């Protein structure tokens, strides 16, 4: 057997929650390119169906399943539907997650409860239903990959999100210890700030500071996670469990944003923020390249960065 064959997922059956867009979509496409048949699970039926169709266009079997991960009955029905079409479940990527921004001294309990329900409880409900299926099938085995965050390790000034993701990391370790006897590997991946629609409205000054704090030199993109997902889904990680794999370009090696973010003058105008949002949503294309802001694509925002950080020609 070639060592490269350890990463081959042909014949494996996978599901990805939150698989319609962003990180989840990238994970679903990466698994499919490695050979796995993939169920795209999401509340967004239109985007989820589009991602599933994109996978099928590559000659790989795919399905879309709608599911609210906070509802145990829906989660159980989702796993049953995946198995009804695929026959078994080998790989599960639990990616569904949300963030609600706001000052922690002002956030209401409803917002807190919603974030914890999706990010932590939803991850547990999915992992539980997935493990039950993996235990029932023959051979008894499986790979469960939870998507956590660097915010589980460093304070990110968003208590509900940070706490929920820290919970995901420890949940992963606990389930790994419990389910190893069933030959189920449970691991998690902790990305940095990733350029996805969920983060489209993050202020430009904050984004540029994130880039500066990332030793590998660019704000993280969904494709930066693909290798880690394939590794943890494949036979290459058969003796790896309980791991929190930090995939952040080295960001957590540096200080986080709290003092800098609050001390940088707000020199990006509302008009420039509007232009940024349109770019980030794909109307005019992402305004970033490997070096950060691309002045050829977005000259007015590049000028705003220069002003905010005192850059001189």
Language model features by range: what are they?
Residues 2-5, 241-313:
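Short C-terminal tail/terminal secondary-structure segment
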Residues 93, 180, 185, 240-242:
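Short, small/polar-rich loop/turn modules that mediate ligand/substrate recognition or access, typified
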Residues 103-104, 108-116, 199, 210:
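Substrate-binding pocket helix/loop in short-chain dehydrogenase/reductase
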Residues 127-128, 173:
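A short, exposed helix-loop element centered on a Lys and neighboring polar residues
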Residues 132, 177-181, 238:
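Alpha-helical segment proximal to the catalytic Tyr-Lys
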Residues 145-167, 172-181:
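Catalytic loop of short-chain dehydrogenase/reductase
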Residues 218-247, 252:
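C-terminal substrate-recognition "lid" of short-chain dehydrogenase/reductases
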């Amino acid at each position: 057997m070639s060592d490269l064959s350890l990463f081959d997922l042909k014949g494996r059956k996978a599901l990805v929650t939150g698989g319609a867009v962003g990180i989840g979509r990238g994970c679903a496409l990466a698994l499919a390119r490695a050979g796995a048949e993939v169920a795209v699970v999401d509340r967004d039926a239109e985007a989820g169906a589009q991602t599933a169709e994109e996978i099928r266009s590559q000659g790989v079997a795919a399905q879309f399943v709608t599911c609210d991960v906070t509802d145990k009955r829906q989660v159980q029905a989702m796993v049953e539907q995946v198995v009804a079409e695929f026959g078994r479940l080998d790989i599960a990527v639990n990616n569904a997650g949300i963030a609600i921004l706001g000052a922690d001294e002002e956030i209401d309990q409803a917002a807190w409860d919603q974030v914890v329900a999706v990010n932590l409880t939803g991850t547990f409900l999915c992992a539980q239903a997935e493990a039950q299926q993996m235990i029932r099938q023959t051979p008894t085995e499986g790979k469960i990959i939870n998507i956590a965050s660097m915010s589980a390790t460093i304070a990110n000034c968003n208590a509900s999100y940070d706490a929920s993701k820290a919970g995901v990391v420890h949940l992963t370790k606990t389930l790994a210890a419990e389910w190893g006897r069933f030959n189920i590997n449970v691991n998690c991946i902790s990305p940095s700030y990733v350029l996805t629609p969920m983060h489209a409205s993050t202020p430009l000054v904050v984004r540029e500071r994130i880039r500066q704090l990332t030793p590998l030199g660019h704000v993280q993109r969904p494709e930066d996670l693909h290798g880690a997902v394939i590794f943890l889904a494949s036979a290459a990680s058969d003796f790896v469990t309980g791991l929190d794999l930090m995939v952040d370009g080295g960001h957590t090696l540096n200080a986080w944003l709290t003092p800098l973010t609050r001390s940088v003058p707000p020199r990006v105008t509302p008009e420039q923020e509007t232009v940024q949002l349109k770019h980030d949503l794909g109307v005019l294309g992402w305004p970033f390249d490997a070096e950060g802001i691309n002045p050829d694509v977005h000259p007015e925002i590049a000028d705003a960065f220069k002003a905010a950080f005192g850059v001189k020609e």
